[in-house]
Amino acid sequence: MWFEILPGIAVMGTCLVIPGLATAYIHRFTNGGKEKRVAHFVYHWDLMERDRHISGVNRYYVSKGLENID
């Protein structure tokens, strides 16, 4: 019947989801607890550069928080 295809769809869906989740967790682990940011547009690149300058350690993923910005 039609429901015999459900296990195959579940396996295929799981195989498609695992790489995306693994990538997010690897980026969080390597970038100090934050996901990797991707700049597809110039505006996003400018925001990442601003965060890099504000952090003081030349890394965009290290945030100081608004209360610590001079």
UniProtKB/Swiss-Prot annotation:
This protein's UniProt keywords: Electron transport, Membrane, Mitochondrion, Mitochondrion inner membrane, Respiratory chain, Transmembrane, Transmembrane helix, Transport
Gene Ontology, cellular component aspect: mitochondrial inner membrane; respiratory chain complex I
Main localization, broad class: mitochondrion
InterPro entries attached to this UniProt entry: NADH_Ub_cplx-1_asu_su-1
Location relative to the cell: Mitochondrion inner membrane
The keyword Magnesium is annotated on this UniProt entry: no
tRNA-binding among keywords: no
Membrane topology note: Single-pass membrane protein
TM region positions: 1-21
Subunit structure as annotated in this protein's UniProt entry: Complex I is composed of 45 different subunits.
Main function: Accessory subunit of the mitochondrial membrane respiratory chain NADH dehydrogenase (Complex I), that is believed not to be involved in catalysis. Complex I functions in the transfer of electrons from NADH to the respiratory chain. The immediate electron acceptor for the enzyme is believed to be ubiquinone.
Family: Belongs to the complex I NDUFA1 subunit family.
Protein name stated in the entry: NADH dehydrogenase [ubiquinone] 1 alpha subcomplex subunit 1
Organism: Varecia rubra
